[in-house]
């Protein structure tokens, strides 16, 4: 199919383009009875929206969400929830010079090869602008998970170019424009971004996303393993080129005696697996990292070709994020929440009546 829908029981279908009239989504499968308002959703949209600092794109969108259906008298009804965000600050003329050119490392070339036509204005459907609706849908999932099951999904920027985070203070994440959990690293990030802006270049980043309070048992082996679904969801985010669950690629250098998460009656002694064993949640924190590439929408000229195959020099004049990772934290949170929400409903549907006397092992013995 066309790939615009995610989920099996809790489904999200998004629509809209970067410079179109609006963005929208349909959330189907949300259980009835969840207290929900536009403000509940707006909180996360405001964390993601552009134009809030000198370090992100200066395109200014209010991203005011409208709930069109599925909510009555402040509660979800169990019917499809329709949501809409109007685009108000498009500047399509910035892209007229590249309408027949393929920007290097963008989806321009591949979209033309696949569809034979493309919306060149701001990348059209391939733009990260689309993720606003993922955040809106994810806000619903996050609220249901927390209100009804005590599951909390949070994230932070763990690396910006060469600046790595060593200390995590959750209270600091929303206190700076980087979603940085270490206040002592913010000045270094600011200086790095100032230099980058002067050079007209861009940089990559790493985001860490964590879900706490997840019960054991979520995940559907074999092909819908929880970690496989999380990787799928996170890789679907624009610019993501790598996903790690738990220790990820660091396991290459670990020995089995260190990597195995030993178990005691008091709880697990470590969490190298990132809260997932055999594709099923273990009850520990679910931890994932994503690596986002540097955007190639630059003021620095780059070589490419046009739609006729002629060599051209491409310079992007539009407004862009010099580091797409700065605003990606709410997006990563949303995608992890959507996976957990879908699997929670799937687990309840198939295994809700399962009874056993196996004790629940505490997430950590520490």
Swiss-Prot record:
Q: Quick one: which residues bind FMN?
A: 125-127, 238-239, 278, 293-297, 319
Q: How is the cofactor bound?
A: Reduced FMN (FMNH(2)).
Q: In which pathway does it act?
A: Metabolic intermediate biosynthesis; chorismate biosynthesis; chorismate from D-erythrose 4-phosphate and phosphoenolpyruvate: step 7/7
Q: Which residues form a coiled coil?
A: none
* Gene Ontology BP terms: amino acid biosynthetic process; aromatic amino acid family biosynthetic process; chorismate biosynthetic process
List ligand-binding residues for NADP(+).
Answer: 48, 54
| Cofactor(s) of this protein | FMNH2
Q: What does this chain do?
A: This reaction introduces a second double bond into the aromatic ring system.
Q: Share what the entry says about its subunit structure, partners included.
A: Homotetramer.
Q: What is this protein called?
A: Chorismate synthase
User: Which species?
Assistant: Cellvibrio japonicus (strain Ueda107)
| Phylogenetic lineage | Bacteria, Pseudomonadati, Pseudomonadota, Gammaproteobacteria, Cellvibrionales
Q: Which gene encodes it?
A: aroC
């Amino acid at each position: 199919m066309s790939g615009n829908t995610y989920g099996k029981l809790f489904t999200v279908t998004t629509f809209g383009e970067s410079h179109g009239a609006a963005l929208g989504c349909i959330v189907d499968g949300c259980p009835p009875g969840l207290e929900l308002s536009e403000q509940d959703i707006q909180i996360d949209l405001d964390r993601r929206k552009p134009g809030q600092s000198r370090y992100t794109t200066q395109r200014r969108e209010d991203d005011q969400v409208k709930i069109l259906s599925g909510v009555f008298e402040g509660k979800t009804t169990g019917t499809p929830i329709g949501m809409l965000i109007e685009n108000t600050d498009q500047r399509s003329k910035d892209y007229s010079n590249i309408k027949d050119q393929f920007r290097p490392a963008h989806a321009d070339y591949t979209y033309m090869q696949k569809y034979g036509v493309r919306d060149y204005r701001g990348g059209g459907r391939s733009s990260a602008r689309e993720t606003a609706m993922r955040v809106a849908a994810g806000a619903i999932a996050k609220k249901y998970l927390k209100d009804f099951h005590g599951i909390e999904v949070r994230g932070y920027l763990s690396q910006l170019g060469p600046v790595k985070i060593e200390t995590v203070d959750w209270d600091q994440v929303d206190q700076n424009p980087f979603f940085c959990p270490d206040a002592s690293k913010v000045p270094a990030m600011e200086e790095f971004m100032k230099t980058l802006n002067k050079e007209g270049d861009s940089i990559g980043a790493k985001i860490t996303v964590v879900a706490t309070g997840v019960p054991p048992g979520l995940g559907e082996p074999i092909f819908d393993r929880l970690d496989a679904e999380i990787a799928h969801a996170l890789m679907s985010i624009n610019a993501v080129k790598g996903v790690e669950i738990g220790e990820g690629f660091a396991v290459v250098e670990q020995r089995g005696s260190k990597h195995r998460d030993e178990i005691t009656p008091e709880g697990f002694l470590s969490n190298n697996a990132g809260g997932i064993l055999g594709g099923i949640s273990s009850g520990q924190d679910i931890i994932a990292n994503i690596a986002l590439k540097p955007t190639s929408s630059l003021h620095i000229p780059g070589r490419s070709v046009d739609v006729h195959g002629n060599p051209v020099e491409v310079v992007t004049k539009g407004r862009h994020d010099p580091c797409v990772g700065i605003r990606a934290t709410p997006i990563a949170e949303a995608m992890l929440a959507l996976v957990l929400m879908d699997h929670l409903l799937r687990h309840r549907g198939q295994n809700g009546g399962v009874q056993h006397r196996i004790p629940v092992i505490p997430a950590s013995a520490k």
